[in-house]
């Protein structure tokens, strides 16, 4: 009876020992960049790999094969990817890709690379000579497949639970979570509509991404239409916004807005590419943009109190971005006509911050263009986030003209400016914890009826604290805020006027103080604000 158990123990030990071998330490890789002049890097050399302590490092190579001529594209270090585990040689196995890619483990293992497509024919099985089977042989041949299969299942489950998706793949479980999240958002009930399954069509070409490995790293946000990932594109971080297929219309709308002539601006989110990934029912639609590590203005204000100069910088660059978005530019930098665009979901969550706190406008999924001689497209009235909806939107009494939509954006800007002031330490008084507009009045999840009662019927607005008005700059800014969220839409300021006012207020205050606390109320009148004739 001991022989079977001894054989089983021997077999299991050999399997475990085999799994412990093969992991080669990767410290350095061969480096090469065919686009070194354009990207301002070295052309070739050695690259030292750096990563997290519990992550594995690899080397990779990518190349083209044009009629038998090998054209090297990239070589270097590659992050933790289970497709590269225990590969001592750099071998590409795809049949006929546009760009070949291989990865391996071990120092300088990418010095040599090769293409070896997986064989399509049946495997050749070794048949031992017909001998009388012994008990040990029967046990070995019976338990070997079972043990190997068990190890594979356990390893696959562990990888699924602990590893990030490799290049070109997305965790479907995460995507379904995004879809469920999108259906529960604080917005209009009709903002999440399933669409019939159909191919969204080819996205515009994105050669920048097509030639470079893209690796998803972690989910940074869940929004109206899906998830936003932090990803790595070679040595740069990018943001990847992933839409499920039923939100194809939002993906197409945002892609079209980004593709509009003149959309390259320092205060608008930089667009990199739009792509379709997957097939059949697992199709995903990707928007790839610049990544900003400080995140949204909402997140930043939750964790940080800001100075007077920081407030002015964010407010000025934010209003500059919205002013440019609203502007109609007949001939923009040789790109063609840039039409006026209304954002329609302006809020602090959709304002991102660069490292120097320069504001960048994002999320153009609900934006609408106003081109001469063309209908503006879907101008459904009640869209956006409820608590930022203007009174006329809550009432359903919108004039479907360009200026009406721009004034709706300006009401929301007034609320975002209030959020900035509420977290500024310039005034001589306490700085409260961060709160969303109307959170103090009607909580974190207001209904449409509650907002109609507070905003439309009672004409209430977020509270302006008395001690804010004792600082000359904040007092003038509060006047500007009140003129942005005016109940009369036609009386609201334009984004360009807000930008000019903030600049003027900052210069006037900083001309006499250096971000210090000023308590003279009379000094508020020292600077004349721009007249309301500057409104839209």
From Swiss-Prot:
- Tell me, which GO biological process terms does this entry list? anterior/posterior pattern specification; artery development; blood vessel remodeling; BMP signaling pathway; determination of left/right symmetry; embryonic foregut morphogenesis; gastrulation with mouth forming second; heart development
* Gene Ontology molecular functions: activin binding; activin receptor activity, type II; ATP binding; growth factor binding; kinase activator activity; metal ion binding; protein serine/threonine kinase activity; protein serine/threonine/tyrosine kinase activity
PTM description: Phosphorylated. Constitutive phosphorylation is in part catalyzed by its own kinase activity.
The primary site where this protein sits is: membrane
What topology in the membrane does the UniProt record assign?
Answer: Single-pass type I membrane protein
Provenance organism: Mus musculus (Mouse)
What GO CC annotations are associated with the protein? cytoplasm; plasma membrane; protein-containing complex; receptor complex
Query: In this protein, which residues make up the domain named Protein kinase?
Result: 214-504
Its family remark reads:
Belongs to the protein kinase superfamily. TKL Ser/Thr protein kinase family. TGFB receptor subfamily.
Task: Detail the disulphide connectivity of this chain as listed in its UniProt entry.
Answer: 29-59, 49-77, 84-103, 90-102, 104-109
- Amino-acid positions noted as binding ATP in the UniProt annotation, renumbered to this chain: 220-228, 241
**Region Interaction with DYNLT1, residue ranges:** 515-536
Name any one Pfam family assigned in the record: Activin_recp
Domain of life per record: Eukaryota
Q: Give TM segment ranges.
A: 138-158
> By its UniProt entry, which PROSITE patterns does this protein fall under?
PROTEIN_KINASE_DOM, PROTEIN_KINASE_ST
Q: Which residues are glycosylated?
A: 42, 65
Its taxonomic placement starts with: Eukaryota, Metazoa, Chordata, Craniata, Vertebrata
The subunit structure is: Forms an activin receptor complex with activin type II receptors such as ACVR1B. Interacts with VPS39. Interacts with DYNLT1. Interacts with BMP3. Interacts with BMP2. Interacts with BMP6.
Function per UniProt: Transmembrane serine/threonine kinase activin type-2 receptor forming an activin receptor complex with activin type-1 serine/threonine kinase receptors (ACVR1, ACVR1B or ACVR1c). Transduces the activin signal from the cell surface to the cytoplasm and is thus regulating many physiological and pathological processes including neuronal differentiation and neuronal survival, hair follicle development and cycling, FSH production by the pituitary gland, wound healing, extracellular matrix production, immunosuppression and carcinogenesis.
Keywords in alphabetical order: ATP-binding, Cell membrane, Disulfide bond, Glycoprotein, Kinase, Magnesium, Manganese, Membrane, Metal-binding, Nucleotide-binding, Phosphoprotein, Receptor, Serine/threonine-protein kinase, Signal, Transferase, Transmembrane, Transmembrane helix
Q: Which residues lie on this side of the membrane: Cytoplasmic?
A: 159-536
Say if the entry is tagged with keyword Zinc.
no
Q: Where is the active site?
A: 345 (proton acceptor)
- Name assigned to this protein: Activin receptor type-2B
